[in-house]
Design a protein with these regions (language model features):
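Binding-site signature for planar aromatic cofactors or substrates
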Residues: 8-314
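N-terminal chloroplast transit peptides
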Residues: 1-4
């Protein structure tokens, strides 16, 4: 139960109007050595920068997001739209002249785009919000360029060349709000986002995670047990990048019930630059974990079966 309690306490700690310490009347206990080990591992596990995570999500997302525009009544309006990222990770769009958000942008370019992770299910999953100006493209060369960018992301969007569809792009980026899940959030300066590169492994993250979850979940559980000393009931990889992977796990609690899923970061011993590198890294980590845990089990067995030494008197 500690994992769920600790996870939510991280979120609560940011709310100044809630009681802190023992003020809420609930008893507090010191974490066990195992819990301390897991906490320390999580603090030190290698992670992408917020800018890299946000850029990767925009770049390798499914190309859909929620655009928010200023309506004629000066209220925010939202719509689910298709987008395509350019080389800077800024979104381009193709909108019908009849759409409400098209009319909004023609009058006021201030807007934002919110993109969630492809498998978004709730507050523990990642989302990014780009805020800036979205303007219609009028230059013929730019128009050709951004139509090609859009078609590359959405090959079936043949209507992008229709006369009643206009091409827009985000021309200025004011700020980026990124939330990677519980207790992982940041406002990213535009310069950091523009300079960051999308992580090359995240392009294949869904395929890697799907394969591991379907065929090799025992290997993931083995790696976590070796790295953190935590035996999992289930371990579902949610994301993979060159530095490691994010895993949703459940554990058996003292009352023998299974916990709610919670997120763990599992770092790689070294960077995996591509899909093949990740595969090799996971094989290596699985073999190392199996060998180490086998050796530990043999040591424990030897300690319990070795008879105590007896002293003899002369």
């Amino acid at each position: 139960r500690w994992f769920a309690t600790h996870r939510h306490s991280v979120v609560r700690a940011k709310k100044e109007d809630e009681p802190q310490g023992h003020q809420d009347g609930r008893p507090r206990r010191e974490p066990t050595e195992k819990e301390k080990r897991i906490m320390e591992y999580q603090q030190n596990a290698p992670k992408l920068s917020f800018a890299e995570e946000a850029k990767s999500q925009i770049t390798f997302g499914n190309g859909y997001g929620v655009i928010s525009t200023i309506t004629k009544d000066d209220y925010p309006g939202g719509a689910v739209v298709m987008y395509a990222p350019d080389d800077d990770g800024l979104p381009a769009f193709s909108f019908s002249t009849m759409s409400g958000h098209t009319q909004d942008l023609m009058k006021n370019s201030k807007a934002s785009l919110t993109v969630t992770s492809n498998d978004f299910k709730g507050a523990a999953d990642a989302r990014v919000n780009l805020v800036g100006d979205i303007e219609k493209i009028t230059d013929e060369e730019e128009l050709k360029k951004y139509r090609e960018i859009f078609i590359k992301k959405h090959p079936n969007a043949f209507w992008v060349n229709f006369g009643d569809f206009l091409v827009f792009r985000m021309t200025s980026l004011k700020h980026i709000r990124y939330v990677g899940g519980f207790a992982r959030a940041a406002t990213i300066p535009p310069g950091e986002y523009l300079e960051a590169s999308a992580d090359p492994v995240m392009e294949f993250a869904e395929k890697i995670a799907g394969h591991m979850n379907e065929d090799h979940q025992d290997a993931t559980k083995l790696i976590i047990e070796h790295q953190m000393g935590l035996e999992c009931e289930s371990a579902e990889i949610k994301n993979v990048d060159r530095l490691g992977m994010t895993v949703f796990v459940t554990v058996k609690q003292p009352d023998q019930t299974v916990s709610s899923p919670f997120k763990l970061r599992v770092g790689f011993p070294e960077e995996a630059p591509d899909r093949v590198g990740v595969r090799n890294m996971l094989k290596r980590m699985t073999n190392e974990a199996a060998s180490a845990l086998k050796a530990e089990a043999e040591e424990e067995e030897a300690a319990t079966t070795t008879p105590p030494s007896s002293s003899t008197s002369s």
